[in-house]
Amino acid sequence: ETELERLALAQLAHRAETGYVQVECGIMDQFASALARAGHALLLHCADESFEHVAIHGSDFEVLVMDTKKPRTLAGSAFNARVRECRESHAVLREHVRDLPWLAQYTAEDLARAGERLSGVQRARATHVVEEMERVASAVTALVAGDVRTFGALVHASHRSTATHYAVSCDELDVITDLACAQPATFGARLTGAGFGGCAIALVEPGAAESVVEPVREGFRARFGVEPGFRVLHAGPGPRELQG
């Protein structure tokens, strides 16, 4: 398959999610699945669906997936609400600050200029989007430089913003990421997917996953009475035919 064919596959899967399932999600998950490359992260520009593969230094960290076992029962309706809130924020900024095609193109200075025209919820959602764009750019720089500590710190800052400004986290996700980040071998952690339950990831020192898993398991079980799941993963290729 060519990258063009994989792009078409991602677009088709996205249409199924938004048109049939009726969740107004972005196309990041479909892109990550269809266009993944072994040993690389994927930098996606959602405005025009352009993308870049960014090499991961394989010896720098491992990805520890942590499953809270909490079903994401609110993810669909709440995710649609976040999309609506972002559109409302964008409309205010276009009318009262400057006319830009995407919310992600605004700056912290633009949000300050909007003043009280943005409601508290609108400001929180816009703040997450604007600051997340800055974090992504900084994260790519750190990843290219092999600066895993800065990369991990940005990942955890992303989680905190997702929880406080975008409000798609939950107690289970906050606790499991905080427990992971309290371990010396962890560089950073954040929720994955739509939030409201499901999994988080932690970036951990190579070969040190078990030293993170045990205290996280004990702390999470003591808090919620649930045994979380764990798995160490690495960046692999996208979908392909398996032979024999």
Whereabouts are the PLM-identified features?
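Fold-level recognition of mixed alpha/beta catalytic cores in primary-metabolism enzymes, strongest
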Residues: 1-65
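Conserved beta-strand and immediately adjacent loop positions that scaffold enzyme active sites
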Residues: 31, 199, 229
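C-terminal nucleotide
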Residues: 40-188, 203-244
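Short beta-strand->loop micro-motif that forms the acidic, two-metal-ion catalytic signature
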Residues: 197-203
